[in-house]
Amino acid sequence: CLCPAQILLNYLPLERALWSSLLKKQRDLYSQFLKEMIIQPGIAKANLGVSREDVTLEDHPLNPNPDSRWNTYFKDNEVLLQIDKDVRRLYPDMAFFQRPTDYPCLLILDPQNEFETLRKRVEQTTLKSQTVARNRSGVTNVRSSSPLKSSPSSLSEYEVLPNGCEAHWEVVERILFIYAKLNPGIAYVQGMNEIVGPLYYTFATDPNSEWKEHAEADTFFCFTNLMAEIRDNFIKSLDDSQCGITYKMEKVYSTLKEKDVELYLKLQEQNIKPQFFAFRWLTLLLSQEFLLPDVIRIWDSLFADDKRFDFLLLVCCAMLTLIRDQLLEGDFTLNMRLLQDYPISDVHLILKKAKELQDSK
Protein backbone atom coordinates (compact mmCIF):
# COMPACT_ATOMS: atom_id res chain seq x y z
CA CYS A 1 0.00 0.00 0.00
CA LEU A 2 1.03 3.64 -0.32
CA CYS A 3 1.54 4.11 3.43
CA PRO A 4 4.51 6.48 3.00
CA ALA A 5 2.82 8.53 0.26
CA GLN A 6 2.14 11.41 2.61
CA ILE A 7 5.88 11.68 3.28
CA LEU A 8 7.09 10.86 -0.23
CA LEU A 9 4.77 13.47 -1.74
CA ASN A 10 6.02 16.07 0.75
CA TYR A 11 2.74 16.38 2.61
CA LEU A 12 4.21 15.27 5.93
CA PRO A 13 7.73 15.85 7.30
CA LEU A 14 9.92 13.00 8.48
CA GLU A 15 9.60 14.18 12.10
CA ARG A 16 6.51 12.38 13.35
CA ALA A 17 6.16 14.78 16.29
CA LEU A 18 5.16 17.52 13.83
CA TRP A 19 2.41 15.52 12.13
CA SER A 20 -0.51 16.28 14.44
CA SER A 21 -0.28 20.08 14.25
CA LEU A 22 0.47 20.09 10.52
CA LEU A 23 -2.41 17.76 9.70
CA LYS A 24 -4.84 19.89 11.72
CA LYS A 25 -3.64 23.04 9.96
CA GLN A 26 -3.94 21.53 6.47
CA ARG A 27 -7.32 19.91 7.11
CA ASP A 28 -8.68 23.20 8.49
CA LEU A 29 -7.32 24.95 5.41
CA TYR A 30 -9.12 22.51 3.14
CA SER A 31 -12.38 23.14 5.03
CA GLN A 32 -11.84 26.83 4.39
CA PHE A 33 -11.39 26.14 0.67
CA LEU A 34 -14.74 24.32 0.67
CA LYS A 35 -16.47 27.22 2.41
CA GLU A 36 -15.08 29.75 -0.03
CA MET A 37 -15.45 27.83 -3.28
CA ILE A 38 -18.54 25.65 -3.08
CA ILE A 39 -21.29 28.19 -2.65
CA GLN A 40 -24.34 29.07 -4.70
CA PRO A 41 -24.79 32.81 -5.23
CA GLY A 42 -28.07 34.30 -4.08
CA ILE A 43 -28.90 31.52 -1.64
CA ALA A 44 -29.61 32.49 1.95
CA LYS A 45 -28.95 30.17 4.84
CA ALA A 46 -31.80 27.73 5.14
CA ASN A 47 -33.73 26.78 8.24
CA LEU A 48 -32.40 29.72 10.24
CA GLY A 49 -35.36 32.03 9.74
CA VAL A 50 -33.27 34.19 7.43
CA SER A 51 -35.23 35.61 4.55
CA ARG A 52 -33.90 35.27 1.03
CA GLU A 53 -31.19 37.78 0.25
CA ASP A 54 -32.29 40.85 -1.63
CA VAL A 55 -31.38 40.27 -5.24
CA THR A 56 -29.32 43.24 -6.29
CA LEU A 57 -27.97 43.80 -9.78
CA GLU A 58 -24.55 42.74 -8.51
CA ASP A 59 -25.94 39.40 -7.34
CA HIS A 60 -28.33 38.68 -10.20
CA PRO A 61 -27.84 35.68 -12.55
CA LEU A 62 -28.14 37.99 -15.59
CA ASN A 63 -25.54 40.45 -14.32
CA PRO A 64 -23.22 41.04 -17.33
CA ASN A 65 -20.23 41.84 -15.11
CA PRO A 66 -17.59 39.12 -15.84
CA ASP A 67 -16.46 39.34 -12.21
CA SER A 68 -19.90 38.69 -10.72
CA ARG A 69 -20.39 35.66 -8.52
CA TRP A 70 -23.03 34.28 -10.87
CA ASN A 71 -20.79 34.59 -13.91
CA THR A 72 -18.05 32.74 -12.04
CA TYR A 73 -20.60 30.12 -10.99
CA PHE A 74 -21.68 29.48 -14.58
CA LYS A 75 -18.08 29.28 -15.82
CA ASP A 76 -17.25 26.86 -13.03
CA ASN A 77 -20.12 24.66 -14.16
CA GLU A 78 -18.37 24.03 -17.48
CA VAL A 79 -15.34 22.64 -15.65
CA LEU A 80 -17.55 20.77 -13.21
CA LEU A 81 -19.45 18.97 -15.96
CA GLN A 82 -16.25 17.58 -17.44
CA ILE A 83 -15.02 16.47 -14.02
CA ASP A 84 -18.40 14.89 -13.29
CA LYS A 85 -18.41 12.93 -16.54
CA ASP A 86 -14.93 11.56 -15.84
CA VAL A 87 -15.23 10.69 -12.15
CA ARG A 88 -18.52 8.82 -12.53
CA ARG A 89 -16.72 6.23 -14.66
CA LEU A 90 -13.58 6.06 -12.53
CA TYR A 91 -12.44 2.42 -12.28
CA PRO A 92 -15.80 1.06 -13.50
CA ASP A 93 -14.73 -2.53 -12.79
CA MET A 94 -14.52 -1.75 -9.07
CA ALA A 95 -17.55 -1.12 -6.87
CA PHE A 96 -15.55 1.05 -4.46
CA PHE A 97 -16.09 4.44 -6.08
CA GLN A 98 -19.85 3.87 -6.32
CA ARG A 99 -20.15 2.92 -2.66
CA PRO A 100 -21.04 5.47 0.03
CA THR A 101 -18.20 6.84 2.10
CA ASP A 102 -18.43 6.40 5.87
CA TYR A 103 -17.32 10.02 6.22
CA PRO A 104 -19.46 12.25 4.01
CA CYS A 105 -18.64 15.97 4.02
CA LEU A 106 -20.87 17.33 6.79
CA LEU A 107 -20.08 20.91 5.83
CA ILE A 108 -21.68 20.40 2.42
CA LEU A 109 -24.53 18.16 3.53
CA ASP A 110 -25.66 20.29 6.49
CA PRO A 111 -28.91 22.00 5.36
CA GLN A 112 -28.12 24.99 7.58
CA ASN A 113 -25.18 25.90 5.37
CA GLU A 114 -25.51 27.71 2.05
CA PHE A 115 -23.79 24.98 0.10
CA GLU A 116 -25.07 22.53 -2.45
CA THR A 117 -23.52 19.22 -3.34
CA LEU A 118 -21.72 19.22 -6.66
CA ARG A 119 -23.90 16.30 -7.67
CA LYS A 120 -27.05 18.42 -7.29
CA ARG A 121 -25.35 21.32 -8.99
CA VAL A 122 -24.69 19.15 -12.03
CA GLU A 123 -28.27 17.91 -12.04
CA GLN A 124 -29.65 21.44 -11.85
CA THR A 125 -27.36 23.19 -14.29
CA THR A 126 -28.83 24.27 -17.58
CA LEU A 127 -25.86 22.66 -19.30
CA LYS A 128 -26.82 19.17 -18.10
CA SER A 129 -28.00 18.10 -21.56
CA GLN A 130 -24.69 19.01 -23.15
CA THR A 131 -21.31 17.37 -23.20
CA VAL A 132 -18.46 19.59 -22.02
CA ALA A 133 -14.85 18.64 -22.70
CA ARG A 134 -11.67 20.57 -22.04
CA ASN A 135 -8.71 19.23 -23.94
CA ARG A 136 -4.99 19.66 -23.31
CA SER A 137 -4.96 22.78 -25.50
CA GLY A 138 -7.22 24.44 -22.96
CA VAL A 139 -10.16 24.53 -25.36
CA THR A 140 -13.59 23.90 -23.88
CA ASN A 141 -16.07 22.27 -26.24
CA VAL A 142 -19.78 22.13 -25.54
CA ARG A 143 -21.68 19.67 -27.73
CA SER A 144 -25.42 19.16 -27.61
CA SER A 145 -26.51 15.69 -26.61
CA SER A 146 -29.61 14.00 -25.29
CA PRO A 147 -30.52 14.56 -21.63
CA LEU A 148 -29.00 12.32 -19.00
CA LYS A 149 -32.23 10.39 -18.46
CA SER A 150 -32.73 9.54 -22.10
CA SER A 151 -31.66 5.93 -21.90
CA PRO A 152 -31.55 3.10 -19.35
CA SER A 153 -27.76 2.89 -19.58
CA SER A 154 -27.23 6.57 -18.81
CA LEU A 155 -29.87 6.39 -16.08
CA SER A 156 -28.08 3.59 -14.27
CA GLU A 157 -24.77 5.43 -14.64
CA TYR A 158 -26.26 8.43 -12.88
CA GLU A 159 -27.99 6.61 -10.03
CA VAL A 160 -27.47 8.56 -6.82
CA LEU A 161 -27.46 7.69 -3.16
CA PRO A 162 -30.08 8.98 -0.70
CA ASN A 163 -29.73 12.47 0.74
CA GLY A 164 -27.13 12.57 3.48
CA CYS A 165 -24.91 10.01 1.71
CA GLU A 166 -22.02 10.54 -0.66
CA ALA A 167 -20.38 8.06 -3.00
CA HIS A 168 -16.59 7.99 -3.08
CA TRP A 169 -16.65 9.35 -6.65
CA GLU A 170 -18.39 12.46 -5.33
CA VAL A 171 -15.51 13.05 -2.93
CA VAL A 172 -13.04 12.72 -5.82
CA GLU A 173 -15.18 15.14 -7.83
CA ARG A 174 -14.96 17.73 -5.06
CA ILE A 175 -11.17 17.35 -4.77
CA LEU A 176 -10.76 17.95 -8.50
CA PHE A 177 -13.17 20.90 -8.48
CA ILE A 178 -11.31 22.63 -5.64
CA TYR A 179 -8.00 21.97 -7.42
CA ALA A 180 -9.39 23.51 -10.63
CA LYS A 181 -10.61 26.58 -8.73
CA LEU A 182 -7.24 27.09 -7.04
CA ASN A 183 -5.25 26.47 -10.24
CA PRO A 184 -7.10 28.40 -12.97
CA GLY A 185 -4.08 28.29 -15.27
CA ILE A 186 -4.55 24.57 -15.82
CA ALA A 187 -7.96 24.06 -14.12
CA TYR A 188 -9.03 20.51 -14.99
CA VAL A 189 -7.81 18.40 -17.89
CA GLN A 190 -9.12 14.93 -18.66
CA GLY A 191 -6.82 12.35 -17.09
CA MET A 192 -6.35 14.11 -13.77
CA ASN A 193 -9.14 11.89 -12.46
CA GLU A 194 -6.90 8.88 -13.14
CA ILE A 195 -4.12 10.47 -11.06
CA VAL A 196 -6.22 11.38 -8.03
CA GLY A 197 -8.16 8.08 -7.98
CA PRO A 198 -5.38 5.78 -6.69
CA LEU A 199 -4.32 8.32 -4.05
CA TYR A 200 -7.82 8.71 -2.70
CA TYR A 201 -8.45 4.96 -2.76
CA THR A 202 -5.31 4.38 -0.70
CA PHE A 203 -6.21 6.89 2.00
CA ALA A 204 -9.94 6.04 2.07
CA THR A 205 -9.20 2.33 2.61
CA ASP A 206 -6.43 2.81 5.17
CA PRO A 207 -6.81 0.58 8.26
CA ASN A 208 -6.33 3.70 10.41
CA SER A 209 -9.70 5.40 10.87
CA GLU A 210 -8.12 8.86 11.11
CA TRP A 211 -6.67 8.58 7.61
CA LYS A 212 -10.02 7.31 6.37
CA GLU A 213 -11.95 10.15 7.99
CA HIS A 214 -9.69 12.81 6.51
CA ALA A 215 -9.00 11.08 3.19
CA GLU A 216 -10.50 13.96 1.20
CA ALA A 217 -8.29 16.72 2.59
CA ASP A 218 -5.15 14.59 2.69
CA THR A 219 -5.70 13.39 -0.88
CA PHE A 220 -6.20 16.96 -2.04
CA PHE A 221 -2.80 18.11 -0.75
CA CYS A 222 -0.95 14.98 -1.92
CA PHE A 223 -2.58 15.31 -5.34
CA THR A 224 -1.65 19.00 -5.49
CA ASN A 225 1.98 18.19 -4.68
CA LEU A 226 2.08 15.39 -7.25
CA MET A 227 0.52 17.63 -9.90
CA ALA A 228 3.20 20.24 -9.21
CA GLU A 229 5.67 17.65 -10.51
CA ILE A 230 3.69 16.36 -13.50
CA ARG A 231 1.36 19.21 -14.51
CA ASP A 232 3.53 20.06 -17.54
CA ASN A 233 2.39 16.75 -19.05
CA PHE A 234 -1.14 18.18 -19.19
CA ILE A 235 -0.22 21.50 -20.85
CA LYS A 236 -0.10 21.15 -24.62
CA SER A 237 1.83 24.39 -25.16
CA LEU A 238 4.76 22.85 -23.25
CA ASP A 239 4.78 19.57 -25.21
CA ASP A 240 7.96 20.32 -27.14
CA SER A 241 9.85 21.94 -24.26
CA GLN A 242 12.34 19.99 -22.17
CA CYS A 243 9.73 19.63 -19.44
CA GLY A 244 6.97 18.61 -21.86
CA ILE A 245 5.53 15.22 -22.67
CA THR A 246 7.05 14.98 -26.18
CA TYR A 247 10.56 15.21 -24.73
CA LYS A 248 9.74 12.50 -22.19
CA MET A 249 8.31 10.18 -24.83
CA GLU A 250 11.45 10.59 -26.93
CA LYS A 251 13.47 9.87 -23.79
CA VAL A 252 11.71 6.48 -23.56
CA TYR A 253 13.03 5.61 -27.02
CA SER A 254 16.52 7.00 -26.42
CA THR A 255 16.70 4.93 -23.22
CA LEU A 256 15.45 1.86 -25.10
CA LYS A 257 18.12 2.45 -27.75
CA GLU A 258 20.77 2.28 -25.01
CA LYS A 259 19.33 -0.87 -23.45
CA ASP A 260 18.07 -2.85 -26.46
CA VAL A 261 19.11 -1.41 -29.81
CA GLU A 262 17.64 -4.33 -31.78
CA LEU A 263 14.17 -3.74 -30.38
CA TYR A 264 14.54 0.02 -30.83
CA LEU A 265 15.40 -0.41 -34.52
CA LYS A 266 12.45 -2.78 -35.03
CA LEU A 267 9.99 -0.23 -33.63
CA GLN A 268 11.61 2.50 -35.75
CA GLU A 269 11.41 0.33 -38.85
CA GLN A 270 7.69 -0.23 -38.27
CA ASN A 271 7.22 3.50 -37.66
CA ILE A 272 5.76 2.83 -34.21
CA LYS A 273 6.15 6.21 -32.57
CA PRO A 274 6.21 6.58 -28.77
CA GLN A 275 3.20 8.90 -29.07
CA PHE A 276 1.12 5.85 -29.98
CA PHE A 277 1.45 4.30 -26.52
CA ALA A 278 3.93 6.11 -24.25
CA PHE A 279 1.82 9.27 -24.10
CA ARG A 280 -0.78 7.47 -21.99
CA TRP A 281 1.82 5.50 -20.04
CA LEU A 282 3.70 8.64 -18.98
CA THR A 283 0.89 11.16 -18.59
CA LEU A 284 -1.24 8.90 -16.42
CA LEU A 285 1.68 7.23 -14.61
CA LEU A 286 0.62 3.81 -15.94
CA SER A 287 -2.69 4.03 -14.07
CA GLN A 288 -4.60 2.77 -17.12
CA GLU A 289 -2.37 -0.21 -17.87
CA PHE A 290 -2.85 -2.26 -14.70
CA LEU A 291 -5.39 -3.08 -12.01
CA LEU A 292 -5.62 -0.52 -9.21
CA PRO A 293 -3.70 -2.55 -6.56
CA ASP A 294 -0.89 -3.04 -9.09
CA VAL A 295 -0.91 0.67 -9.97
CA ILE A 296 -0.46 1.45 -6.27
CA ARG A 297 2.48 -0.98 -6.11
CA ILE A 298 4.13 0.73 -9.09
CA TRP A 299 3.54 4.17 -7.61
CA ASP A 300 5.03 3.03 -4.32
CA SER A 301 8.30 2.28 -6.13
CA LEU A 302 7.99 5.40 -8.26
CA PHE A 303 7.51 7.82 -5.38
CA ALA A 304 10.23 6.16 -3.31
CA ASP A 305 12.86 6.70 -6.02
CA ASP A 306 14.93 9.89 -5.77
CA LYS A 307 14.61 10.36 -9.53
CA ARG A 308 11.03 9.16 -9.62
CA PHE A 309 10.21 10.15 -13.17
CA ASP A 310 13.51 8.92 -14.55
CA PHE A 311 12.53 5.61 -12.97
CA LEU A 312 9.17 5.82 -14.76
CA LEU A 313 11.08 5.91 -18.07
CA LEU A 314 12.91 2.76 -17.02
CA VAL A 315 9.63 1.06 -16.09
CA CYS A 316 8.35 1.86 -19.58
CA CYS A 317 11.53 0.43 -21.10
CA ALA A 318 11.19 -2.66 -18.93
CA MET A 319 7.65 -3.14 -20.24
CA LEU A 320 8.99 -3.02 -23.80
CA THR A 321 11.93 -5.36 -23.25
CA LEU A 322 9.76 -7.93 -21.44
CA ILE A 323 7.70 -8.41 -24.61
CA ARG A 324 10.65 -8.00 -26.99
CA ASP A 325 10.26 -11.45 -28.58
CA GLN A 326 6.63 -10.77 -29.48
CA LEU A 327 7.48 -7.28 -30.75
CA LEU A 328 10.38 -8.55 -32.88
CA GLU A 329 8.12 -11.17 -34.48
CA GLY A 330 4.98 -9.08 -34.81
CA ASP A 331 3.83 -6.79 -37.60
CA PHE A 332 2.68 -3.20 -37.08
CA THR A 333 -0.93 -4.10 -36.26
CA LEU A 334 -0.07 -6.84 -33.79
CA ASN A 335 2.58 -4.74 -32.08
CA MET A 336 0.26 -1.76 -31.72
CA ARG A 337 -2.30 -4.04 -30.09
CA LEU A 338 0.35 -5.31 -27.66
CA LEU A 339 1.44 -1.81 -26.71
CA GLN A 340 -2.04 -0.39 -26.30
CA ASP A 341 -3.29 -3.38 -24.32
CA TYR A 342 -0.18 -4.46 -22.44
CA PRO A 343 -0.20 -8.26 -21.94
CA ILE A 344 1.89 -8.70 -18.77
CA SER A 345 0.07 -8.20 -15.47
CA ASP A 346 2.93 -9.17 -13.12
CA VAL A 347 4.11 -5.74 -11.93
CA HIS A 348 6.76 -7.28 -9.66
CA LEU A 349 8.44 -8.71 -12.76
CA ILE A 350 8.26 -5.31 -14.46
CA LEU A 351 9.68 -3.45 -11.45
CA LYS A 352 12.47 -6.02 -11.09
CA LYS A 353 13.39 -5.53 -14.75
CA ALA A 354 13.30 -1.74 -14.36
CA LYS A 355 15.68 -1.98 -11.39
CA GLU A 356 18.02 -4.17 -13.46
CA LEU A 357 18.01 -1.55 -16.21
CA GLN A 358 18.68 1.15 -13.63
CA ASP A 359 21.61 -0.77 -12.14
CA SER A 360 23.10 -1.52 -15.56
CA LYS A 361 23.94 2.12 -16.23
Per-range role (PLM):
Residues 1-361:
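Helix-rich, well-folded core regions that mediate interactions or catalysis
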